[in-house]
């Protein structure tokens, strides 16, 4: 019952935000919950482990143009399924909008599928809080972060 209520709350809160992104030439990345383990101030680094690579571009939903120097905060469960400072990072997209991050495959956390949390920020755009869900058996993925311009 509690899981159902949580899902309903997510749909109500984030569904409205997702609908606000409709009509853009570049579909915005869907928002997702930040969860209870976010902590600001993660060290600037692009690697917290090896075995899984996440790459992509930060883009504008308005015209699909790339956004350089966007701040991306990342956190994930460690191999043992526990969150900790060793599994947190802050990185920035390159001038061409691209980013790359290396980690281990996140360990199991409760009944949740393996996932990586991300927050993307850039001047002139709404903050994006989302999650990347790993496909089983993969060693990497491309995950673009498409941001909605400020009103």
PLM regions and their residue ranges:
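Beta-strand-dominated extracellular/periplasmic modules and repeats
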Residues: 21-151
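Sec/Tat signal peptide C-region and signal peptidase I cleavage site
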Residues: 16-20
């Amino acid at each position: 019952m509690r899981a159902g209520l949580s899902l309903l709350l997510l749909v109500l809160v984030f569904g409205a935000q997702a609908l606000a992104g409709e009509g853009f030439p570049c579909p915005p990345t869907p928002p997702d919950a930040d969860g209870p383990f976010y902590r600001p101030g993660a060290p600037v680094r692009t690697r917290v482990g090896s075995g899984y690579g996440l790459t992509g571009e930060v883009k504008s939903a308005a015209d699909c143009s790339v956004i350089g120097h966007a701040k991306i905060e990342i956190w994930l469960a460690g191999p043992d399924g526990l969150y900790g400072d060793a599994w947190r990072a802050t990185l920035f997209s390159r001038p061409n909008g691209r980013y790359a991050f290396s980690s281990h495959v996140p360990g199991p956390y409760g009944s949740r599928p393996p996932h990586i949390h991300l927050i993307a920020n850039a001047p002139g755009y709404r903050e994006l809080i989302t999650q990347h869900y790993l496909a089983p058996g993969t060693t990497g993925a491309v995950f673009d972060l498409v941001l909605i311009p400020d009103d």
